[in-house]
Design a protein with these regions (language model features):
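Bacterial Sec-dependent N-terminal signal peptides
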Residues: 1-47
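Extracellular, repeat-based ectodomains that mediate carbohydrate processing or recognition
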Residues: 46-361
Length: 361
């Protein structure tokens, strides 16, 4: 028996969204990775195609969680992938975009694949070095980079800044203009954590701390964020607050943006933040009470005018059914709209990884 999970890869002009799908067999500890490739143009759309990659671990969602940034990276005419195999080893792969043949490398590193939090995040810098961070759920920073540009050989683990790297969860890389990289992670625990931000300079070939505490949970809560860097280089950041380890304490949707690679932050109306951002000075894109089945860690984007769009779901007070929503700013004010018509109720309760009946958008 096979379960199918697929995500399209679309390319439209200069915009690219890339991810991968999997086919899972319930009686085996691994699954086949596949790519679904598709190109959308103004003239015609092509049918997607499947590209088999290899066997990956499947007893948890560690290879498929939505907060991996990124597990699939394209630079020039080459594409890179990362995943855990059936034995928990970190595997890297690359291929030419016009080829279905992957070159795979089982690295020297393993992860605790039984915990779906312990994802792999990777990114290529402007010189072609591959940067990876992996296997975190309140652990010391695990970070390494390739030994040479465009190779699958990884060097030893190393520190980035050697400051506040002992309790890391949700590592994420983002490309910046000029080939530099942004790296964010949570320092602390669920309900008691802060958002930390680093910047990698290709010129200096080193990491620098941008924000020791960008979003401060004040030892009372933490932010579960989603981040997007638009074509102009503006960093868009949105998040929900969580008061405790329990998912039902998720509440509200907040927003901030930066035009200078994370140094200075603003609200959507242009007002400058006094950092760090806390509960009392955050901009609230939408007020959503606790116990609303509000999901954390979803997706966001921005239009060509730099206006943010956030995809999420929650339940209205007079309903038992969570609905998908789009929350956006039009340059003047915030809006939100229900974009689904679901009929099946469910509840988000308790701590840990949940078996959720609908996907994070």
């Amino acid at each position: 028996m096979w379960d199918h999970v697929f995500i399209d890869i679309w390319q439209k002009d200069t915009f690219k969204f890339q991810s991968f799908g999997a086919v899972h067999r319930a009686d085996h500890n691994s699954f086949f990775f596949f790519l679904i490739l598709s190109t959308l143009t103004t003239l015609r759309a092509q049918q997607p195609r499947l590209v088999e990659v290899g066997n990956g671990y499947s007893q948890t969602s560690v290879n498929t969680t939505v907060f991996r940034n990124n597990s699939l990276v394209t630079q020039g005419d080459e594409q890179y992938i990362s995943y855990y195999d059936g034995d928990g080893y970190l595997v890297l792969g690359k291929r030419k975009l016009d080829s279905d043949q992957w070159t795979l490398k089982r690295t020297q590193y393993k992860g605790n694949v039984k915990d779906a939090h312990n994802i792999i995040s990777m990114m290529l810098d402007g010189e072609g070095y591959l940067h990876l961070s992996f296997d975190h759920h309140g652990h010391k920073l695990n970070y390494c980079r390739s030994t040479a540009p465009y190779t699958l050989e990884l060097g030893d683990k190393e520190s980035m800044t050697d400051v506040d790297e002992g309790n890391v969860t949700y590592p994420e890389f983002y490309p910046l203009n000029g080939g530099d990289l942004l790296f964010v992670y949570r320092s602390g625990s669920s309900g008691r954590g802060n958002l930390v931000m680093n910047h990698y300079s290709v010129k200096e070939k080193k990491w620098n701390r941008v924000q020791d505490v960008l979003i401060d949970g004040e030892d009372q809560r933490n932010a579960y964020w989603q981040l997007y860097v638009d074509e102009q280089g503006t960093i868009h950041l949105s998040w929900v607050w969580r008061e405790t380890w329990y998912v039902e304490t998720n509440h509200d949707l907040c927003y901030a943006r930066s035009y200078d690679n994370g140094v200075t932050w603003y609200k959507a109306n242009g007002k400058k933040y006094d950092l760090p951002i806390r509960y009392n000075n955050a901009e609230y894109a939408c007020r959503i009470p606790q116990n609303s089945e509000l999901i954390n860690q979803t997706s966001m984007s921005a239009d060509t005018s730099g206006n943010p769009y956030i995809a999420t779901y929650w339940r209205d007070p007079d309903s038992e059914v969570p609905q998908y929503r789009i929350v956006w700013h039009d340059g003047q004010m915030w809006h939100n709209r229900q974009v689904s018509n679901r009929h099946t109720p469910f509840s988000l309760k308790g701590g840990g990884t949940k078996m959720i009946p609908i996907a994070r958008p």
